[in-house]
């Protein structure tokens, strides 16, 4: 894990990684949907973690909020975690990757850190029941953003995340 902060792009298969990433990358701000705050107890605790909460119905305005608040958090020494597929996907599946994380990294001139794992095999999106097993997390090399555009950055991150997940 680099000493300087940046943008974390993590596969999103379960609730597990939302908790674990807080321990792996301390002093972190997650981009999440605002509706999670409405869950009793859980939402209240979540609000105390300094997340970047967005209303996904706002479309491009939500992206501008992520860029503004994300840049501020990184300048303050926080990691910013995004799930580039936008929502949890079933284990072994692939969602559509958005370019918001790459846009933030370019805005602040920081690297992107890709993260792959197999948590969805044990903490399934489809079930409340958790299965026993060993969750493996792989943190990729820091991906430089200098001289690249959003599409190139996301293609590199997506390829690494998906190919690494296939090996787990």
Regions found by a protein language model. Name each.
Residues 1, 14-15, 87-88:
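A short, conserved beta-strand element in the Rossmann-like catalytic core
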Residues 1-2, 45, 74, 106:
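Short, flexible hinge/linker loops that cap or flank conserved catalytic cores
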Residues 1-5, 131:
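A short, glycine/Asx- and small/polar-enriched loop/turn
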Residues 3, 39, 64-67:
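Structural motif corresponding to alpha-helix initiation and N-cap regions
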Residues 4-10, 78-82:
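Generic beta-sheet signal
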Residues 6-59:
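Catalytic core of membrane glycerolipid acyltransferases/transacylases, capturing the structured
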Residues 64-168:
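Non-catalytic C-terminal accessory region of glycerolipid acyltransferases
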């Amino acid at each position: 894990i680099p000493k300087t902060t940046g943008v974390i792009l993590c596969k999103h298969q379960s609730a597990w990684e939302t908790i674990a990433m807080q321990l792996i990358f301390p002093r972190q701000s997650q981009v999440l949907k605002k509706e999670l705050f409405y869950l009793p107890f859980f939402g209240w605790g979540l609000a105390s973690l300094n997340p970047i909460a967005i209303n996904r119905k706002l479309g491009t305005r939500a992206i501008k909020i992520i860029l503004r608040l994300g840049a501020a958090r990184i300048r303050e020494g926080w990691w910013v975690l995004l799930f580039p597929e936008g929502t949890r996907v079933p284990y072994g599946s692939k969602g559509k990757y958005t370019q918001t994380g790459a846009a933030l990294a370019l805005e602040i001139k920081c690297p992107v850190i890709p993260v792959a794992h197999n948590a969805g095999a044990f903490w399934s999106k489809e079930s409340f029941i958790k299965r026993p097993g060993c969750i493996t997390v792989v943190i990729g090399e820091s991906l430089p953003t200098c001289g690249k555009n959003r599409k190139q950055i996301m293609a590199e991150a997506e390829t690494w995340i998906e190919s690494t997940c296939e090996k787990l």
